[in-house]
Amino acid sequence: MRHLTSLKELSKNEILELLDLADNFIDSEGSIRRDPLFPDKKVVNIFCEPSTRTKISFEIAASNLGCQIIDFDLSSSSLEKGETLKDTIDNLAKMNINLCVLRHKDSVIHELIDQTDSMVFVSGGEGSISHPSQGLLDIMTVRHRKDLDNSNILIVGDLDHSRVFQSFIDGMSNFDSKITLCGPKELCKDV
């Protein structure tokens, strides 16, 4: 796995390997430990939609891994002057950015991946399609409390427009748990 764009693309073993890797960064007291494994890597977070928790979580994670975090302020970028996202990514790749975390209202990440092979992409959320990092976090939360293969899980809410719900379902489809869905009819038409 080179990019993380959707949990649909991951096998059960790949998900478990990612969760095991994440668990290795939690110390015996439950705190996240710093381990500067990548001091020569540059990470840019491009968030074309508002975000607090996801954006800051990725910044903290990159910092904990020793990465150089490139501040990308959408409002002062050339995107505001009409530059395309493809051109922005092309320029960042030429600046030797190693990893791009992208949040966008549309499904554009695969087009950008096809454009450059020098940068790794992680989806920080795409429209109502996917949010793989949040899906992995939710699966990890279940795993810390229950067996992923033998749980009963109830999901309540707006299931038609939730990228988090979709990613959780995509990831959990690899496991043998019973998932029950619930919500107002007008918010669960597509389920």
Residue ranges with predicted function:
Residues 1-56, 60:
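Positively charged, low-complexity intrinsically disordered leader regions
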Residues 89-93, 97-171:
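Anion-binding alpha/beta catalytic cores of soluble intermediary-metabolism enzymes, centered on
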Residues 10-13, 38, 49, 53, ...:
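Conserved active-site and cofactor/substrate-binding residues in soluble primary-metabolism enzymes
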Residues 41-45, 67-70, 98-99, 119-122, ...:
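Structural motif
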Residues 74-77, 125-130, 184-186:
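Short, acidic/turn-prone active-site loops that include or flank metal/cofactor-
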Residues 48-60, 143-191:
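Glycine-rich phosphate/diphosphate-binding loop of Rossmann-like nucleotide-binding domains
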